[in-house]
């Protein structure tokens, strides 16, 4: 029997992803930056929903000549039991006077980050994690019901469908990339020192800096990419 180069189910290489935590909300400033982030407690689920990329078959010479795919866009669903005060403006709510809020206002764009765990068969969910960055997102209106209190312990959850607009990435290490609104950072593959610096940026340092989400080109530059932006980094709106 041949000794195959491909190896299946080796110890330490049975990977999976689980969990969601460390959510952070970042309001989009008029200058196109994502600063003054707020911790988003109460996250219960985040679903990434890429859409588009529909296939269009081209026929010639009485046969299928080729397949072309349309552009892809990124969306998500955020499920939670609460949200930070700053998210109210992104939900079409404005506090007119302290404690009194009106709805139906302009929905502002925002940035969002969260963490998912990476597990394996040895370290389980402590093997590593991914940090997800979502840019220039807007939340769609959703219904919210209020039910009577009874002998069950169900808590009313909220769910927000999110659409995004891609930001310029530029040319990195000689390769030109399309605009994106979603980036993942894998803790098991990046330099730990650079990751620590990155986390200080996106989560802030108590008593020193507030959470800030770097723009895509800034993220790649921090982790060692040689970036040539196609337009000025902070002039993407």
Roles of regions detected by a PLM:
Residues 64-140:
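Structured, beta-strand-rich domain cores
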Residues 1-48:
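Polar/acidic, low-complexity leader/linker segments enriched in S/T/G and N/D
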Residues 33-34, 116-128, 172-181, 188-190:
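Acidic Ser/Thr/Pro-rich low-complexity disordered segments
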Residues 48-50, 59, 63-87, 153-167:
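Oligomerization/assembly interface segments of phage tail-like spikes and tubes
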Residues 141-235:
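Mixed-charge, glycine-accented linear interaction segment located at domain edges/termini
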Residues 3-12, 25-31, 90-96, 114-120, ...:
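Short, charge-rich amphipathic segments
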């Amino acid at each position: 029997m041949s000794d195959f180069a491909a190896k299946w189910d080796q110890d330490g290489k049975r990977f999976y992803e689980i969990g969601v935590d460390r959510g952070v909300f970042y309001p989009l400033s008029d200058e196109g930056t994502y600063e003054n982030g707020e911790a988003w407690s109460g996250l219960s689920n985040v679903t990434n929903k890429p859409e588009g990329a529909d296939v269009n078959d081209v026929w010639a010479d009485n046969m299928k000549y080729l397949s072309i795919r349309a552009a892809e866009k990124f969306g998500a669903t955020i499920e939670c039991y609460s949200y930070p005060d700053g998210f109210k403006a992104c939900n079409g709510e404005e506090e007119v006077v302290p404690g009194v809020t009106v709805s139906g206002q302009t929905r502002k764009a925002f940035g969002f980050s969260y963490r998912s765990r990476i597990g394996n068969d040895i370290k389980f969910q402590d093997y590593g994690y991914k940090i997800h960055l979502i840019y220039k997102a807007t939340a769609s209106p959703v219904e919210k019901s209020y039910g009577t209190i009874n002998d069950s312990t169900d808590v009313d959850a909220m769910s927000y469908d999110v659409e995004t607009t891609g930001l310029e990435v530029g040319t990195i290490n000689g390769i030109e990339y399309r605009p994106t609104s979603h980036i993942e950072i894998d803790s098991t593959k990046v330099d730990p020192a650079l990751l620590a610096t990155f986390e200080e940026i996106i989560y802030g340092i108590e008593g020193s800096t507030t959470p800030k989400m770097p723009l895509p080109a800034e993220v790649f530059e921090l982790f060692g990419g040689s970036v040539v932006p196609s337009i000025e980094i902070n002039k993407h709106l």
